[in-house]
Amino acid sequence: NSRHQWWIEQGISKERLELDKVKDEDLSHYSKSTIDIIYNFPHGKEELEGIANRTDFDLGSHTKNQNEFEISSKVISNKDSTTKLVIQNLENKKWFVPYVIEPSAGVERGVLALLNEAYFEDEKNSRLVLKLKPHLSPIKAAVIPLKRNNDELVNKAKLLKKELQKIGLGRVMLENSGNIG
């Protein structure tokens, strides 16, 4: 499942993810099949995303001249439609209403799951670390001169920051509020 893989690529551990096929009796009236992507939070399991096969219900409901096409869903006649939402099969030249696959994810749960995965307690150095995947990190690099009161080092750090920005690295931060060396 490509959506399952997408969550893993964002930083979600595959061991904490489950795919759950929704039982037929629990499906929405328009759905032929729905798969939920479940995340195992510390407080329990919750759905991150649902992926529904909505069949031809959506496009069939909104297409013009519905009776000209074999629509598998039970749709109400739509006399106001001005467009035929159909595709032609190039092999047999028949027109058909395509199915819609609808992924539906909540931002809040997704972000919470990502933060849960990225949160790390570095006990050796007594600090908390947020280990985001590089493509999610708002800051791609930090340039930190060893001494803030050394003009030569600070100027070189500023130059390095500009060079990193020029190559398109992303957001680069210059941190010179204290000494690290």
Task: Give the location of each predicted region.
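NTP/phosphate- and nucleic-acid-binding module
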Residues: 1-181
